[in-house]
A protein has these predicted regions:
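N-terminal, positively charged regions that mediate nucleic acid binding
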Residues: 2-7, 192-196
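Accessory RNA 3′-end/elbow-binding domains used by RNA modification enzymes
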Residues: 55-60, 77, 100-244
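Non-catalytic RNA-recognition surface used by pseudouridine synthases
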Residues: 3-129, 149
């Protein structure tokens, strides 16, 4: 959930890797050794066609599953932990496991425990917690819970390569100007055409842009355009203009 300018970050966060706890219902008895062999076939690059009931076009999509762990087994119920790319359909994965097993299967329950850097154990909260913290603030003037669950939007770019820019470069970027090499003070490695977060010396998020060159080319010291802004987060004219 994003508020105000932070809503612009949601698209980037939604594309990050996911981790799920999934309850799989087999339609026949399968021993653990056989199930492990079946599941191992789905680790790596897979091809999926979205289920009939989905919000996207039903075309073949390539996704990557990084790991599938069996947490528990009771009769025909299998508890799984799955780490995957964004956009991987767990419902379809459960169905396909049953197809390979030769008896069918379906997903009974699903819980997302990680989205990018946001995890259930650290900084993910339920809508109920949001509602309760807002109630405390409005009715008891207690903002402690709101402060606990509200994170600065800079937190949302932890998984994106970053560049630190000089104060004189900030305002031009907020007007949509491309970032040139002289304005960069520090950077993390990035590839060409990769999303890069642009931050001030104070760590404030200015923009997210697409790299025009790879970071290795910056070592040459040659002047030129480095980042093309895609999403601007900072308001204009907070930092002084470097032009007249």
């Amino acid at each position: 959930m994003g508020l105000e300018n932070a809503t612009k970050l949601m698209n980037y966060i939604s594309k990050s890797g996911k981790e799920y706890i999934c309850l799989l219902q087999m339609h026949c008895n399968v021993d653990q050794k056989e199930l492990k062999e079946i599941i191992s076939q789905f680790v790596g690059e897979i091809y999926q066609k979205p289920p009939v009931r989905s919000s996207v076009k039903r075309r073949i999509r390539k996704r990557r599953i990084y790991a599938i762990d069996i947490l528990d087994m009771q009769d025909k119920l299998i508890l799984l932990r799955v780490q995957s790319d964004a956009g991987t359909y767990m419902r379809k994965l459960c169905h396909d496991v049953g197809v390979i097993a030769g008896c069918g299967s379906h997903m009974r329950e699903l819980r997302r425990i990680r989205s990018g850097i946001f995890t259930e154990k650290t900084n993910m909260v339920t809508l109920q917690e949001v509602s309760e913290s807002l109630y405390l603030y409005r009715n008891c003037k207690d903002e402690s819970e709101l402060r606990r669950i509200l994170l600065p939007m800079e937190y949302g770019v932890c998984g994106i390569p970053k560049v630190i820019v000089s104060d004189t470069a900030v305002n031009a970027i907020t007007y949509g100007a491309k970032l040139n090499l002289p304005g960069i003070l520090a950077y993390q490695n990035f590839r060409k055409n990769q999303d890069v977060a642009v931050l001030t010396l104070k760590g404030e998020l200015v923009a997210i842009g697409e790299s025009i060159v790879e970071s290795k080319q910056l070592e040459s010291g040659k002047k030129g355009e480095v980042i093309r802004p895609k999403r601007i987060f900072m308001e204009r004219d907070i930092y002084p203009k470097s032009w007249k």
